[in-house]
């Protein structure tokens, strides 16, 4: 039971740090951040969200502006890694039927149908396994998933 309590507490602290790190940008008049929120947004990517000014928004890996970023924070108390199989297993996110990858797809269709303007990010203290095939699909510069 104490392991579960520690995981919950540490996970909440991790999410809060991400939120406040983004929210602090609101104090900088030169920051592209215009709004920050938490616990709202597309299911599975609702821990923290950030809205950016269109004229100062960060660009995606293809140079297009990202107007909104949805972040899912995944904290683990144990040291480990993850891989492609975890992204399609609902149990990995403590769900019954829908995996993180399915939730990412649903969020993309609902919030950025053409694939532009929104980013859906998984932030975790685990790394992708050294030998996992998923590693080869990650752009090392932008840390994005290459689908082509």
Model-derived segments and their meaning:
Residues 8-88:
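Catalytic centers of nucleases
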Residues 1-8, 12, 63-148:
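Acidic metal-coordinating catalytic centers involved in nucleic-acid phosphodiester chemistry
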């Amino acid at each position: 039971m104490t392991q579960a309590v520690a995981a919950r507490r540490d996970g909440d602290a991790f999410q809060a740090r991400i939120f406040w790190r983004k929210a602090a940008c609101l104090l900088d008049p030169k920051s592209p951040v215009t709004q920050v929120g938490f616990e709202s947004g597309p299911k599975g990517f609702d821990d923290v969200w950030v809205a950016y000014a269109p004229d100062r928004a960060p660009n995606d890996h293809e140079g297009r502006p990202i107007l909104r970023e949805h972040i899912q924070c995944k904290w683990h108390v144990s040291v480990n890694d993850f891989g492609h199989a975890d992204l399609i297993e609902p149990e990995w996110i403590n769900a019954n039927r829908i995996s993180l990858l399915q939730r990412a797809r649903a969020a993309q269709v609902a919030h950025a149908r053409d694939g532009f303007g929104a980013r859906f990010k998984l932030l975790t203290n685990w790394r992708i396994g050294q030998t996992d095939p998923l590693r080869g699909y990650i752009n090392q510069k932008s840390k994005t998933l290459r689908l082509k």
